[in-house]
Amino acid sequence: MTSRFLLQKNSRRLHGGLAKGVAVFRRTPKTCKTMPGEPAPSGQLPAATDLSSLQGARVALVADDENVRIGALRQQCRFSYGLLLDRVTKEAKPVAAIAVITAAPGDDGRQNYLETRGWQALVLPREQHAGANGPRLYTNVDTDLGTETGYLLGTTSIDVLLICSGDGDLCLSIARAAARHRPKVRVVTLAVPGSASHQLWRRRDLFAAHIALGRDLTRPLNRQPSASNPKTYV
């Protein structure tokens, strides 16, 4: 970045005194190299998801279900776990695929959906906690997701850890732990454009790449229940 210092004569009075000159800094625009997968400024979903950063690697996938699900809904679509795992299987060698979800007691629809598509579902109960303004629904899964990811890092032989979440604080915490304990493991994030922290593609010291979810890994909102099991979806 360059700066040019220009001294300009100015007869305006500043703070009650006559200014003999005003120092003006003019900065030339800085050109930044983009990180692989950096989403477009518009926040729109690309047509295709670029998984080239996973090519041939042993990959462990961990997903923050609430984050990617809500992010996809904002884009008027649904995130497809089945399509993602199919694509990763073609590009790489998935070792584990875990999604952390929350569900009310007796509601196993989301769990069935994930397990029939090759994912392991870690189900946390939706709990009401007392707050200053009365009871509130508690659905934060960050601690459990971080713990499960730490277990994966300590017990599996992988080249890449793929975090499916746009939560910057969560992903940074996991990436720092991976850098401390498994420095050879590359940490890659996948998130929905418009619902992803800028840190995911700017912190090149922690993340090897960021993958912007494309429409090829989504389903329309008006999906239909499966004929064989009304609690699962096509």
What are these regions (language model features)?
Residues 2-234:
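Terminal and domain-boundary accessory regions
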